Amino acid sequence: VDYLAELDPDALRGARIGVLRKHGVSAQPDVEAAFDRALEALKALGAELVDADIATAGQWNDAEFEMLLYEFRHGLDAYLAASGAPVRSLAELIEYNKAHADREMPLFGQELFERAQAKGPLTDRAYRDARDKARRLAKAEGIDATLARQRLDALVVPTAGPAWPIDPVNGDHFTGAGYGVAAVAGTPSI
């Protein structure tokens, strides 16, 4: 299939694209340089670039984390049950890790596993409330409101920076990612 044959070279002419400068990867000069080149390419194709901001940015974080704990347990339990792995659930994995802590957890614990294990099913009111709040803040009051308020056709943001080195002493050196709002909102991020 030749997808390029179907592309319209004038598709971006006149499109208003919101640039989310505060919601992507922070302090990554190579990423910023690549992003600037991409913005120049969009302008060269006729797009109008507009600085944009999602007013609710970060307000969904607590609700999103609550969702993560519920969904992690639910998803991992389903995966392990079907995988043929020697452990069949998150609860079994936690117990395995405890029994082999010197080998499985020499540098860190399993606090997130244990917090996820303490959550109930995806039908719990707390889960549904967190899901609804996160989606409302990220989608209706976030992405959708930003698009409407500024009459934008799309938003653009760097999705992620380069992988960071593994640091078993100080932990991850995560520098941010622009895909989070789209993931929480349930909207495409391409």
Feature locations, PLM:
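Short, solvent-exposed coil/turn linker segments
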Residues: 2, 53, 89-92, 154, ...
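A short beta-alpha structural unit
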Residues: 56-66, 98, 128, 163-165
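Generic preference for flexible, low-structure residues
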Residues: 13, 33, 65, 92, ...
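Short helix-loop capping/hinge segments that flank enzyme active sites or metal/cofactor-binding pockets
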Residues: 4-21, 70-139
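Glycine-rich, small-residue loops and helix-cap segments
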Residues: 31, 41-44, 114-190
